[in-house]
């Protein structure tokens, strides 16, 4: 009998299994193969489902998904044994205490507390002092701290602990939709190329500002990471506090404390002027607070933070007229061994330091120049660049140098200021501003020195046996020596 006929005969035999009779062998073979295939499909289905769930759960640790975008931002994985092997740590050195802190970007409870600040005034307004969020910050070389007052509760109190991180809070998209009424247009506080800022209220009643970043060619990822790593782990009463963030799908959002009295640009040039004009004391309080914040970023922590976009609209003001430096989307971090970095020129026209604009070399001296322009803006009430004015008055810095050089310094004061500042107060502020905008970067003072100058009730340079006369922008200004400060504001060697 041919083999084919024998095989057909065998496959056609009727066999009984499991009580089933009369089924041919080939039918049983097909049933077994079919059951095997179904089992394989079930196993694959279970495996795929498990993988999807594991991906969802891993997305709750968002920093593992964000690519490193700048070599200037140093994020160190912990080099010691720790209970969170997949967590990230950011190394921070506080120069004022000599301590090294490791900021943990993993799941743990938050214990952030705040302190309060002071009071100031505005024409036609009376405001009482009250407790306000903020924290102390120290100046490394100055050896002192600014801030103080009773400790107040964290704005994150009452939120689900499962979302707490070491320095802030992880918010879901649903959390922020509820807080902002689904990002209603009526809650828009401001917008720009970076995205839109909304006012919101968390479930615990805390008012917040939610920055929703626009994902233009990955810019949202870049700005998100820069801001989180620049200020997510630092606390100072004059820095706007980053409360947390949201990463969900393509959404990148940052959640800040809500600062309720606008910004310096609005008070000097915009809508807040309808509430009255800032007094000289209020302006100097805002400027001094900004100087303290920059001194903390430049001198009290490592790596130091260069803000790169100091301008009036980034100086938020609370209801006690305390400055809150904000918007760190352009910030760069410098290690202690770096004198500068080379980077693409970014910033706001009129505030950018000339050496940075010309060469792309960036360090903290660029921020100091921008601060000097900001101080001039507060003194004069003028924009840094105003093409609506005569040609010789378009550039604020050049116009002021010309006015000082022709001995007309008292004419530069904002005409809306009532009462006007004393001659000594005006002279001190002008001297500080001119030193900050010195075209030679190395001659600009450090921000801790600037803060001390602005806080002093006397001339910033104490008298010695003899005065040294120098010319600043063409006008002779008596500039006395300090035992520790040279004519450029830098430390002198014994």
Swiss-Prot record:
Gene Ontology molecular function terms on file: ATP binding; protein serine kinase activity; protein serine/threonine kinase activity
Top enzyme class: transferase
Intracellular or extracellular location(s): Membrane
Region annotation Disordered: where it falls in the sequence: 442-494
Catalytic reaction annotation: L-seryl-[protein] + ATP = O-phospho-L-seryl-[protein] + ADP + H(+); L-threonyl-[protein] + ATP = O-phospho-L-threonyl-[protein] + ADP + H(+)
Pfam families found in the cross-reference section: Pkinase
Record membrane topology: Single-pass membrane protein
Protein kinase domain residues: 183-462
Chain positions found as Phosphothreonine: 172, 343, 348
Sequence positions that bind ATP: 189-197, 211
Keywords: ATP-binding, Kinase, Membrane, Nucleotide-binding, Phosphoprotein, Receptor, Serine/threonine-protein kinase, Transferase, Transmembrane, Transmembrane helix
Principal location class: membrane
Active-site residues, as the UniProt record annotates them: 309
CDD domains for the chain: STKc_IRAK (cd14066)
Gene3D superfamilies, A to Z: Phosphorylase Kinase, domain 1, Transferase(Phosphotransferase) domain 1
Cellular-component GO terms for this entry: cytosol; membrane
Sequence intervals crossing the membrane: 28-48
Location of Phosphoserine modifications: 313
Family in the record: Belongs to the protein kinase superfamily. Ser/Thr protein kinase family.
Name listed for the protein in its UniProt record: Probable receptor-like protein kinase At2g42960
Organism: Arabidopsis thaliana (Mouse-ear cress)
